Amino acid sequence: KHSLPDLPYDYGA
């Protein structure tokens, strides 16, 4: 996802 990440390592996912 490219919106608001739930996890700190989920930014580019």
UniProtKB/Swiss-Prot annotation:
Cofactor: how and how many bound: Binds 1 Mn(2+) ion per subunit.
Keyword set, alphabetical order: Manganese, Metal-binding, Mitochondrion, Nitration, Oxidoreductase, Ubl conjugation
Post-translational modification summary for this protein: Nitrated under oxidative stress. Nitration coupled with oxidation inhibits the catalytic activity. Deacetylated by SIRT3 upon exposure to ionizing radiations or after long fasting.
GO molecular function terms listed in the Swiss-Prot or TrEMBL record: manganese ion binding; superoxide dismutase activity
Cellular component annotations (GO), alphabetically ordered: mitochondrial matrix
Subcellular compartments: Mitochondrion matrix
Cofactors demanded by this protein: Mn(2+)
Subunit comment: Homotetramer.
Family of this protein: Belongs to the iron/manganese superoxide dismutase family.
Name listed for the protein in its UniProt record: Superoxide dismutase [Mn], mitochondrial
Gene (UniProt): SOD2
